[in-house]
Amino acid sequence: LNYQLSPSFEYQSDPWFTHVWKGVNGTPTKKRAIGFKKLAKAVKFSTKLMGQAMAKRVKATILYATETGKSQVYAKTLCEIFKHAFDAKVMSMDEYDIVHLEHEALVLVVTSTFGNGDPPENGEKFGSALMEIRHPSSNSAERKSYKVRFNSVSSYSDSRKSSSDEPEHKDNFESTGPLANVRFSAFGLGSRAYPHFCAFARAVDTLLEELG
């Protein structure tokens, strides 16, 4: 016996698999066979269009420095979001060649601060390179440790931002630094339980602004 309750919901196959296209006279029409050559041309054409569209997008480089991997997760999430409108890529600071920095259009920095104002291990090279570009010194005796230097830059960043809130502060000026054409933003992860809160992120933000 086959009992069927009514009303009921019945499963049916997808209509695009079972529908039969009919011509003017009501007779079934034959499906158009697409050859491999035509399909390959269509794929090549669509790839070319996508390449042209991607070439017009602004390139965005996302740099991260981390000790625990949290900043890397944030950086990858940020990259996925920016890929909707930018030609974005993400990489660690120790893998980035600082020589390419002045040719970037948009740089996004995601970094934590390790310990008492120290940069993460994979961010030391990048931070030191920025510091040397901003404050070149041939005398090794005059060079302070990166910890002291980044903390001092971070403290200067706080005083600079507080002074920029004053009415007489002027924002209209023409930048002539080596990174004048680079747009940037820095996002820091840290805890206010430490005296130097997000010191490395603030230092990178300040150095990029001074160089641009």
Swiss-Prot record:
<dbReference type="Pfam" id="PF00258">
    <property type="entry name" value="Flavodoxin_1"/>
</dbReference>
<dbReference type="InterPro" id="IPR008254">
    <property type="entry name" value="Flavodoxin/NO_synth"/>
</dbReference>
<keyword id="KW-0112">Calmodulin-binding</keyword>
<feature type="domain" description="Flavodoxin-like">
    <location>
        <begin position="60"/>
        <end position="212"/>
    </location>
</feature>
<keyword id="KW-0349">Heme</keyword>
<dbReference type="InterPro" id="IPR001094">
    <property type="entry name" value="Flavdoxin-like"/>
</dbReference>
<comment type="function">
    <text>Produces nitric oxide (NO) which is a messenger molecule with diverse functions throughout the body.</text>
</comment>
<keyword id="KW-0521">NADP</keyword>
<keyword id="KW-0274">FAD</keyword>
<dbReference type="GO" id="GO:0005516">
    <property type="term" value="F:calmodulin binding"/>
</dbReference>
<keyword id="KW-0479">Metal-binding</keyword>
<feature type="compositionally biased region" description="Basic and acidic residues">
    <location>
        <begin position="158"/>
        <end position="173"/>
    </location>
</feature>
<feature type="binding site">
    <location>
        <begin position="186"/>
        <end position="212"/>
    </location>
    <ligand>
        <name>FMN</name>
    </ligand>
</feature>
<feature type="binding site">
    <location>
        <position position="11"/>
    </location>
    <ligand>
        <name>heme b</name>
    </ligand>
</feature>
<feature type="region of interest" description="Calmodulin-binding">
    <location>
        <begin position="30"/>
        <end position="50"/>
    </location>
</feature>
<comment type="similarity">
    <text>Belongs to the NOS family.</text>
</comment>
<keyword id="KW-0285">Flavoprotein</keyword>
<feature type="region of interest" description="Disordered">
    <location>
        <begin position="155"/>
        <end position="175"/>
    </location>
</feature>
<keyword id="KW-0408">Iron</keyword>
<dbReference type="GO" id="GO:0010181">
    <property type="term" value="F:FMN binding"/>
</dbReference>
<dbReference type="GO" id="GO:0004517">
    <property type="term" value="F:nitric-oxide synthase activity"/>
</dbReference>
<dbReference type="InterPro" id="IPR029039">
    <property type="entry name" value="Flavoprotein-like_sf"/>
</dbReference>
<keyword id="KW-0560">Oxidoreductase</keyword>
<dbReference type="GO" id="GO:0046872">
    <property type="term" value="F:metal ion binding"/>
</dbReference>
<dbReference type="InterPro" id="IPR050607">
    <property type="entry name" value="NOS"/>
</dbReference>
<protein>
    <recommendedName>
        <fullName>Nitric oxide synthase</fullName>
        <ecNumber>1.14.13.39</ecNumber>
    </recommendedName>
</protein>
<keyword id="KW-0288">FMN</keyword>
